[in-house]
Structure formats: structure tokens, C-alpha cells
From Swiss-Prot:
Protein name: Potassium-transporting ATPase ATP-binding subunit
This protein's record includes keyword Cell membrane: yes
UniProt EC number: 7.2.2.6
Organism for this UniProt entry: Staphylococcus aureus (strain MSSA476)
Gene responsible for this protein: kdpB
Location (main, coarse): membrane
Cell compartments where the protein resides: Cell membrane
Summary of the function given for this chain in its UniProt record: Part of the high-affinity ATP-driven potassium transport (or Kdp) system, which catalyzes the hydrolysis of ATP coupled with the electrogenic transport of potassium into the cytoplasm. This subunit is responsible for energy coupling to the transport system and for the release of the potassium ions to the cytoplasm.
Classification via PROSITE patterns: ATPASE_E1_E2
Transmembrane domains' residue ranges: 34-54, 65-85, 216-236, 245-265, 569-591, 611-631, 644-664
Amino acid sequence: MHHVNKYFNQTMVIEALKMSFYKLNPKQLIKNPIMFVVEVGMILTLILICFPDIFGTSYLSRGYLITIFIILLITILFANFSEAFAEGRGKAQADSLRQAQSNLTARLIEENGAYRIVNATELKAGQNIRVENGETIPADGVVINGLATVDESAITGESAPVIKESGGDFDGVIGGTLVTSDWLEIRVESEAGTSFLDKMIALVEGAERNKTPNEIALFTLLTTLTIIFLVVIVTLYPIASYLHLILPIAMLIALTVCLIPTTIGGLLSAIGIAGMDRVTQFNVLAKSGRAVEVCGDVDVMILDKTGTITYGNRIASEFLPVNQQMLEKLIVAAYMSSIYDDTPEGKSIVRLAKQMYINELPKDIDGTYKTFTAETRMSGIITNEISVFKGAPNSMINLVKQQQGNIPLNIESLCMDVSSKGGTPLIVIENNVMLGVIYLKDVIKDGLVERFTELRKMGIETVMCTGDNALTAATIAKEAGVDRFVAECKPEDKIKVIKDEQAKGHIVAMTGDGTNDAPALAQANIGLAMNSGTISAKEAANLIDLDSNPTKLIEVVKIGKQLLMTRGALTTFSLANDVAKYFAILPALMMSTIPEMTSLNIMHLSSPKSAIISALIFNALIIVALIPIAMKGVKVKGYSIDRIFINNMLIYGLGGLIVPFLGIKLIDMIVQFFV
């Protein structure tokens, strides 16, 4: 969320430092087996400081042991700090959200119409409340009366107020948001503890953050490597005794810490938490870390045309009559079919009709209004004298044919002309007579071509689903740059599209906001629901966009890719580090007893004691150096998967081999004067 950037300050750093010490508790640290091994080594070193000869005679001074102890402690604190700082972001967000719902009261509307002030926690679903200008909405609900602007910045971070009114797509309100003009009467939809704000707090606080399958697999690998290195170190002791080489326990502890994958072990949790945080920064709530991670595996994106590829509010641009004598009749009929249509398209038709018609049009019409449905794909009104409908060409043509009406010869060409321009044609009929076509203009969002090109490079195929005919769909798909399209697609057809792609082994992501989208959102591997959407859609999805911007799916998928690549890059760096440190330290440790090892001491480290201290210091510092990468993620923009893989292998693989040699040598050049 944009409004929590103010929390990245000194206070957060201090809190993270405090948590770093709290996480030294073995009960906390055992969740990270690698760092737990480091802590065990630190405790053993502390015992050696107090009782130097407890494990046999040692030539190491107490000062040297204290140095090892301090470096091991700092290593653990650095690892704890990276995790605590990442967690601190979520806690800062949760605190800001709690402020939005603290000490709220509500103006409850009684059955007799009177008002009663109650505590917001006493509200029950189904009750009606009134909220005036300057008051905070106390609970989630639906506007049943009134029109007002609402400041949702406490939730979304967007400072511009939004208009809320009954009916249409913008009647849902969230508890904790502020009414900044007029008044609203709201039907309560949630009770205390179950509101959207409560769920947000639980999500961003991450109290129940479970490890994702990939994290578990990687942790298993790292734990196995740790055990292998422990076995290697343990076998060194009898070998050293056989060769009459004195290897103090403190040296073996330090060597163990240097060789096990402490770098990635110290950063792994922070990478996962930071990945979820980056999604939150885009005003998207992830219900689990797994949801963000699966985004990284997505290779097919199902995108709605309306609202995702186009701006969503198709605007009535022109009335096209079957002949010019029908123009006035077409305008009046289009107006009548839309007068009770609360959709943006319907309202734009009413506006255009008023602009074009010279005489005054009626404000109210007595009759039965038929709303648009995905099945009928038409809407209109039936009165005692007349029936007027507008709708999709196929639906209207079938309706007229069923009633033995005539189809004008030029109606199809009028529809084709509109479709070829990327618009949406709606045929208008009056008493089963076709009058003409309404041209609804679609406007494609800026910058989509470049973004789709970028996704294509990353190996992601884009599929546009639209209820438009094939000609309109093809025109828009070509202009927007999507890979494929599915025309005349109903909500239930999306499930088939998703299942077909999944049957081919693809990982599918999609967006949706309506109740009819809920099954498809649940079927998709990744479902992004709009905050302005229905409760069922938000429950079915595993991601919720607070800005209700469907194009966010593109950003979320890129963040998921970045999360996986960051984890892979830092794991590669850590393991390459271990290999380099092994060949850097072991020869220096053994060369005093085994002269042949001198030739392998390519770094010319001054002494075994200096080598160990230098490696330990490097081991601690590299965790701090990599925290920014763990938090921000590796760069993935504009590159293909193959290019990113090669770059990461060069930077983090080869770099992971070279950096330890250089770093340890530089530190050794300084340390040799003190050891």
C-alpha cells in the first residue's frame, strides 16, 4: 500500500533490532534449522569461553574465543534483522489499518425511521445505517440510498475520493472509509471481526504465514546440505587427530558456520515476506504466500476485454439507423431501452439520446424493465403499447426470427462496420422491428502493447475473453497485442477455457469481479478479484485488488516471477559461496601440519586463526549486503527467461565463487594485525 511508505523510518529499524534479539530465543530460531545450528555453535563457544579446556587442551586464547562468539552472535542477529524488518512492514500496515476502525460508532436506522447511536461492534448483518458527511463508515455494506464521495485512502492508499451510489458497480462500501460529501444509507453486510478490514489486518500482519511448497522444498535441501557439512566437519576431527593436527572445537564450530548455507538460510524467510509485501505495495492482498509464489509459475493469463484491456466504460458514440427515416425512432427506442439501465453503457446511451433528440424525452416510463443477463444478452422495457429491446446482434437477430420478423438487409453490414473499428454493436428493436445499431466505442488502455510484449518474453501467453463477436474481438486483440482471443465468451465458458489450458499442463491466472466469475476464479491457479466485486468473487479468489484494476494481474505475475528468481539467485550465490569458502579456508587451516596444502592456499591467508576470523566476518557481512536484494528482488524487467537465467548464473553463480575469495582476502589483510 502506498500510504505505508512513511513507516520505512528509524522507528521500524529500531523495532526490527529489538525483534532480532527476541528471535534469539531457541524456540523461535528452531524454525530455521540452519541458523539454529549457528546458535548451537555460539552457545558451545560461550561454554568454551567460560571453561576453555572442557573439550581438551586448546591453544586458542579467551580473547580469540570471545571474538568468535561475538561474530556468531552478530551473524544470527543480522539474519533475524532481515526477517524482522520484512515482518515490520506488515505490522506497520496493520497498525495503520487498525487506526481506521478504532472507536467507531454508527447511526442505526430503526424500523420506525428514527436514528439510534450504537457502537460499531454491535452492528448486525442486514441492519441499515446512515452515514453523514465527515463521518467514518462503521461496517462493510451496500448503499441502498443516497450518493456521496468516499475517501478510501485508509484502505487503498488512493487519495482521490470515489463516488458511491445505490445500484450499479459502485454501491459497495468498506468499514473504516470516510464519507467526504452528502450522505449514504447503507445495509450492513458484515459483523465485528469478519469485516474486510479485519481480514486485511490478519493478512498483512501475517501471523499465520505458512511456508510455501517451494520454500519447504528449498528448506529441505538446505537442511540436508547442513547435515552433510556437519558430517564432513565431524569427520575432520578424527582425521586431524590421526595426523597429529590440533583442531580446537572452536575452530571446527567456526568452520561449520562458514560452510553451511547461512546466507540463504538467513534470508529465505525475508525473501518470502518481502515478496508478499511487494504485492501489497501494489494494493493487492494475497491470502497466502503460496498465492504469490504460484504467480511466478503462471504461463497463461486469461484477461477480460472490458476493464482489463479496454477502459471498461464503453461509451455510446453513434446511432446508425437502417435508413435515415428511422433515426429519430432509433434514438427514442434506444433511450427507452436504457432509461432504467444503471450500467455505464446504458447511462451513456441516455446521454447521447438527450444530446441528439430535439424534443424532450420522458423521464419516467411505466412498464416492466428487463435487465441484461449473460444468457439473454439483451435489456429493454415492455409497456402496454410497446416493447423495446437492445442487445447483442446474434441475440436480437434470433429473437426477431423466432417471432417471424424481418431482418433488414443492411443490419449485418452496420454491425460489421462497428466491429471492424473495434467497437461493440447493439441492435435496437421496437415491437419486433429492427431500427438500427448503437455504436459502443471501446478504448484500449495505454501501454498494454509493451506490457504484453514483456510478458511474451517471460514465456507468458495472454488470452483475451470477450462477449463480443469474432470480428470485434480480433480487431481489439490485434490492436492490444494479445496472443489469442475467445469471442462470444460467457462467464461459464471461462471455466472451460481454464480447464483446457490446465489439461495442457499450463498454470493459469485470471481476473474477475462478479458472482458469475466466482467458479472460474476458484478453478484458476491464480484468481485476482476486484475489491469492488461481489463477496463470492472475493472469497473464491486468492488475490484481491484494492484498486479494482484488473491490469494489476500483470504486475502480480511479474512479482511472483521476481520472487522465485530472487530465491533462486540468492540460493545459487549462497551455495557458490560455500564452495569457495571451503577451498579458501581448509588449505589455510591444514597447511601448518600438511605442507602440501600450502600450494592450495591460493589466497595466501596469513594464518589458520586469521583465516577463520576473516571467513566468519565475511559470512556475517554478506547477509547484510544481500538484505536489499532480498527485499527488492532481482531485476527481471524486459528480459526473456533464458536471458534472466544466464544473467543470474553470471552474477550470482560466478559472483558467488569470486566474491568470497576477494572478500575474505581483504578482511584477512586487516585481521592479521590483530590476531
